[in-house]
Amino acid sequence: MALSPMMQQYLRIHDAYPDCLLLFRLGDFYELFFEDAKTASRELELTLTGKDCGLEERAPMCGVPFHSVNTYIEKLIEKGYKVAICEQMEDPALAKGLVERDVVRVITAGTVTDPTMLEDKVNNFLMCVFLDGKHAGIAWTDVSTGEFYVMEPEISLLGAQIARIQPMEVICNDAAALISVVGNGVRGLSGQPQAWFQRKNAEETLCSHFRLTQMTSLGLEDRKYAACAAGAMLKYLLETQKNSLEHIRSLRFAENGRTMLLDQNTRRNLELTESLRGDRKKGTLLGLIDKTSTAMGGRLLRSWVEQPLLDPEEISRRLDAVEELVKDRVLGMTLSEELEGVYDMERLMNKVAYRNMNARDCLALCASLKRIPGIRGLLLNVQSGEMTRIREELDPLEELTGLLDRAINPDAPVVITEGGIIREGYSAVLDEYREAQTSGKQWILDLESREREATGIRNLRIQYNKVFGYYIEVTRSFLGQVPDRYIRKQTLTNAERFMTPELKEVEQKIIGAQEQSVRLELQLFTEIRERIAERIDSIQRTAQALKKLDVFQSLSRTASENRYVRPLISTDGSLSITEGRHPVVEQNLKDGEFIPNDTLLDCGENRMMIITGPNMAGKSTYMRQVALICLMAQIGSFVPAKEASLPVCDRIFTRVGASDDLASGQSTFMVEMSETAHILRNATRNSLIILDEIGRGTSTFDGLSIAWAVVEYIADREKIGAKTLFATHYHELSELEGHLEGVKNYCISVKEHGEDVLFLRKIIRGGADKSFGVHVARLAGVPHPVIVRAHEIQARLEVSDINQNKIGQNILGEESVNRKNEQVDLFEYKKDEIIQEIQQIDVMAITPMDAMNKLFLLKEKARKI
C-alpha cells in the first residue's frame, strides 16, 4: 500500500521543515499528523484521532479551527516549539486535482508579530551571534517593530550583553562554542548554516535587503563580525518569514562606550524592571517611572532604564527636555492626553510589511496621524534641543491621512474579504455595485408582498442563505395554495422552499453585484495598503519622535509628582547627594515617613564608605538608593533628593544577598565569591560598587579575612579605587579608617531605651559598637527561651578573650552550671505566658461556655509547668 497523494504532499513539505510542527491547512482547520499530532495533542490537550492515509494503519491526527489558530500557536511557542504554517495556495473549489499547498511562514519565539501574543511595552528580540575565535559580532531585531541593531562586544562581555538584551531566541554559527563562552542559560538557542555567516554571503544579503551597492552606506565596512551576524540574521528572517521585511529599513551600530552595561546581578538587585518577587511592575523602578501613554514610549523607556548613558552631553540634553516639561506642567499633561490617542505605529508598520493590515488597523493609523498637528502646535515654543528635534521630525502625512479618511469605513469589519470596508463615495464603480445590491434587495421585498397578495399565503417569506441562495418558503398548512409556476427547491419538516424563474434572475444580479463589490473592495484596499507601505520611512520617523516625546513627558510627570530634582553632572568625579531617598521604597510609606540620607563620595579621601549596623536598620535600602539615583540621572531622569551632583559612572556593580544556585550546583558562598570576583575583575575607578555582607557565607574568621582583603583591593587606586559602599557586620573593618586612604566609617543611628531599640534609619559618621542581632531576632518572633539563651551566650562571649575554635568549649563548659538557671528561666517564661493569656481575655464579651473552656486550658498549662 502507498500513501495517499495528500499525505505524500504533507510529508514532502514537512521534510523541508524538520524542526517545526507543521500546521497543514485543510478547509476550515489546520491539521497535524504523525509525530506532530502526538506532540500537539499532548501539549495542547487536543483529542488525538486518526485519518486514512493509504497505509494499513490510520495516521495519528489532531487539528484546530483556522479562526482560533493563534491561541494554539502561542501555547506552542511558549513551550519552546517552532511552528510552520502551511496554507492552501489556491481555491479548493477551483483546483484541478490536489490543492497546491506551501509554507507561508515559520513562527518562532523570536519572530512573533501577532500583537495578541506580545506584551505591549516589552520588545521581542531575536538575536544572532557570530563567533570567530576571540572575536564576536551580534545582531538583534524586534521583527514586530522593525528595530535592528548590531554590535561587536568583547568576548568576555558577550554573556552580559545577551543578558542585557534578553532575546527570546538566539541563533548562531556555533551553538556549542557559544555555550562554552556564556553558559547554558541562552534561551531558544539553535545553530544555523555556516554559509549564512560567511562574510561574502552576509554582505550580499545585507546589500540586497537595504538596496545598496556597497557596505559603506551601512557603516559596517570595518566591522566584519557585526556584518556577518547581521547578514545571517536577515537570511534567517527571509527564510522563516517569507516576505521582504520592508519595515526593517535601517540598522544601528551600538557603540561599546555609548551606554552602561548592567550585569544581571545589578539589574536584579536594583529591581529595575522586575522585582525580587518576580513582579514586572509593582516594586520596580520601571513600574514607578513608567507613565507613558503609548506602547512605543513604554518600550523605549524600558530600553533607557536598561542602558544608562555614558556621554555627559547626551545626558544633559535629555535632562533639558525633561526640565522644560517639569517647568510647564500644563504642557506636559496636555501632551500626555494627546499621546493617549496614538496607537502602536511601529507594530502597525509590521502589519503593512506582512500584508496583514486590516481596515481597523488603517483607522488606528489614521487616528494616530491626526494627533500630529495638535502635538506639533503644542511644541511650537519649546527651546531644548531634543524637544525642537522632535517637533521637526513629526510628519502629519496629511495626504495619507486624507486618503484613509476618504477611503475607510469608520465601522469597517476586521475581515477584509467580506466587504463593508470602503467608505461610500470613494469609488463610483463600487457605489454602483452597492446600489445594484440595494435595489435588488428592495425588489425582493416588493416581490414578497406581490406573491403574498397573489397567492393568499399570509406567511409566505422570501429568504436567503449561502447554500441555496434566495428562495420562497411556504409552511405545510398553505401548500395547497402554491401555484404551479413555483419550482420546488427543498423540503423541510414543516415547510417547503420554492424558486421562480423571475426570482432566480434577480438573485444572479444581486449575487453578481455582491461578488463584484467584494472583489473590488479588496482590490481598492490592497492599493491603499500599498500607498501606506510607500510611506513606511516617514511613519517610522514620526513614531520614533512620538515615543521619545512620550518618555520625556513620563519622566517629567514622575519628577513633578514625587518632588524630584535635576541632578548636576559633576566634572571632578565626586558624588554628592543631599537628602536622597529610595524612589520605590518611599512610595510604600506615608508622606514624610521615609528618612532621607546624605551621601558624599569623591576621588580622594571619601572613596569608600564602610557601613556597619544591624539587619533591618536600612543599610541595604540606603545603598540601593544611591545606586538608583546615579542610574536615574544617567537615563536622563530627575532624582529623588533635595540636591544631587553626580559623576558619570561607567559601571554600577551590586552584590546584595546570596542563595544556593541549585541549577549549577553552587553553594551560597560560591555564588557570593563568584559575584565578588566578577566585580573585582571588571570595576574601574569610575565605577560605583555596592557590596553587602561580603564573607558571611563561611566561618567568621574566613569571612572577615576575605572582606578585609576585598576592601583593601578596592581602596587601592592602582588596582581599582572605585567609589564604594560596603556594608558589613564585621565591626573589625572599622579599624581600616585611618590606615587605608579614602576609607570612612558610617553606621545606622540607633536609639536605645532599656531593652527596646529604635532604628532611626539615619546614616551617621562613625562605626557601630553593637550589632543588635538578638534584638532583631526578638522582633522577628523567635521564641522567648531562644532569645534568653542567646543573651546568655552573647554575654559570655563578650567578656571572654577566646579564639574561634574554643568558642564552643567555652560555652559548653558553662552548660552544667547554667542548666538549672535555664529551667528557672523557662518556668518564668511559661508563667508569663499564662498571665499574658489571662490579660487578653475580654471578660465583657466572652460567653459562659467559652469562659469554662478557656479556664480548662489554662489549668492544663499550669499543671504542666
Positions of PLM-derived features:
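Extended active-site and interfacial segments that coordinate phosphate-rich ligands
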Residues: A37-E56, T141-P167, G480-I511, D591-L601, ...
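Charged catalytic and DNA/RNA-contacting regions of genome-maintenance
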Residues: M1-E324, M333, E337-A353, M357-S449, ...
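Active-site phosphate-binding and catalytic loops of NTP-dependent enzymes
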Residues: C86, A109-L118, S244, V382-E386, ...
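Amphipathic heptad-repeat alpha-helical coiled-coil/stalk segments that mediate oligomerization
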Residues: Q198-E204, M260-Q264, L276, A367-Q442, ...
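Intracellular alpha-helical coupling/juxtamembrane segments of multi-pass membrane proteins
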Residues: I315-R318, E338, V342, A436, ...
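Conserved catalytic alpha/beta cores of large enzymes that bind or transform nucleotide phosphates
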Residues: P167-N173, E502-R535, F638-A641, S645
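ATPase nucleotide-binding head domains, primarily ABC-like/P-loop NTPase cores
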Residues: F34-A37, R223, S293-T294, L301-W304, ...
